[in-house]
């Protein structure tokens, strides 16, 4: 990444709230409770219920786990679009989500897009990063 890109990423807020078409949307890196907390599709519903109580949002969009999912728990939609580049679910294809909102309906569609992983691997090798990073990109898994 360029220094400008690194600087931009480092200065992003850890959370943000937006209101759109009558929906209260919270954007978080990790969870609403902790930006370092991993939320996965197999995280217990009990944990999602705990978060739903305090979040004051209709939609919670997270990242951090790099794992795509959509759960609707206690009136709150929990969505993770996945990751464009470094997946953790065993599929190296990039992942994103398209969220369609109307006043009374929310529809989430997840998409996977293959990309040339070997081009990324070549760049990683140029940077002399440990071999585990090459393995992670090729396997689409978190290995560290």
Where on the chain are the PLM-derived regions?
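Short, acidic/polar N-cap/turn motifs at the starts of alpha helices
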Residues: 13-17, 67-68, 96
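Short secondary-structure capping/turn micro-motifs that flank functional sites
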Residues: 25, 68-69, 140
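Acidic, metal-binding active-site segment of PIN/NYN-like and related structure-specific nucleases
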Residues: 60-66
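Short active-site segment of divalent metal-dependent hydrolases/proteases
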Residues: 32, 67, 85
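Conserved catalytic scaffold of divalent metal-dependent phosphoesterases
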Residues: 1-59
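Acidic, His/Gly-rich catalytic cores of divalent-metal-dependent hydrolytic chemistry
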Residues: 59, 72-144
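Divalent metal-coordination and catalytic microenvironments
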Residues: 9, 29, 64, 82, ...
